Regions:
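N-terminal flexible segment immediately upstream of the FAD-binding catalytic core
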Residues: 1-57, 74-104, 133, 256-261
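N-terminal cofactor/phosphate-binding cores enriched in small/glycine residues
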Residues: 71
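FAD-binding subdomain of flavoenzyme oxidoreductases
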Residues: 95-99, 105-252
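The start of beta-strands in P-loop NTPase/AAA+ ATPase cores
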Residues: 64, 84-86, 245
Length: 264
């Protein structure tokens, strides 16, 4: 069966958009990883868990590789279709399903932009702590797949520390649920944490329940110059030894400051 017929057969079987135009294939061939390009056979854009399952079931039956992708902001090549096949774009699955104000939880689809989630829960007086530098464009699904962190990791940890449970689809199309809607859950294997950071190699995440905190009532930003990197590191150690845990810490060298000043 030729490539065009394969893609048409996939679209019919999965019931979701399957893109084969040059622009879509070119966009799906790269992420923010430098100098790497891998062109897929096609781009499937499911809108539900059922459609993700149908895509994977079809691909499994035909022996065609599938590479899931979010916003393609990653720097480690996790979204690149290195073996060709189907690029599975989850960008259409971008719903915030439910914000649970009582239990401080939120249930989301993988295509939700992190900043959109942060703003939505903040409107309810809640706080999602994971704050990667690309929060304005990266997705929750990508964060989970890569176990993303950010400057706030110093106090709040990384993505794995905020995932309560997952809905995911295995390579053969089987839909599974992991974990529970509780902070303490010691029942069975910890499949949730097995999937976090797996870069889409074990399953495709289609829904996640995340922990939230009450929104901080006060914040302060401090910019402090130091004569040397050693002095800055010593100051950080002294801050922690004094019992103060900042929500975020960032270090900027003099050269970076000068470049920034020259272009702002």
């Amino acid at each position: 069966m030729g490539d065009d017929l394969l893609c048409a057969d996939l679209a019919a079987a999965a019931g979701c958009p399957v893109l084969t135009d040059p622009e879509s294939l070119d966009r799906a061939s790269r992420d923010e990883t430098e100098d790497l390009r891998f062109r897929p056979l096609c781009v499937a854009e499911p809108r539900s868990t059922a459609e993700v399952s149908a895509v994977l079931r079809w691909a499994h039956a035909h022996g065609i590789p599938v590479t899931p992708a979010g916003a393609r902001t990653g720097l480690s090549g996790g979204a690149l279709a290195a073996h060709g096949g189907i690029a599975l774009s989850l960008r259409r699955m971008d719903a915030i399903v439910c914000i649970d104000e009582v239990n401080h939880q939120v249930r989301v689809q993988p295509g939700v932009i992190v900043q959109v989630l942060q703003e939505a829960v903040a409107a309810q007086g809640l706080f999602y702590a994971v704050d990667p530098a690309s929060r304005g464009s990266c997705t929750i699904g990508g964060n989970i797949a890569e176990n993303s962190g950010g400057p706030r990791a110093v106090k709040y940890g990384v993505t794995k520390d905020w995932v309560l449970n997952l809905e995911a689809v295995l390579a053969d199309g089987t839909v599974v649920r992991t974990g529970a809607d509780t902070l303490k859950n010691s029942t069975g294997y910890n499949l949730t944490q097995l999937l976090v950071g797996s870069e889409g190699t074990l399953a495709v995440i289609t829904e996640a329940t995340l922990k939230l905190l009450p929104l901080p009532t006060h914040t302060a930003l401090l910019l402090a110059p130091f004569p040397s990197a050693l002095a800055a590191c010593q100051a950080v150690a002294a801050i922690f030894q004094a019992g103060v845990v900042p929500s975020a810490l960032e270090f900027m060298e003099r050269e970076a400051v000068e470049i920034g000043r020259a272009h702002v």
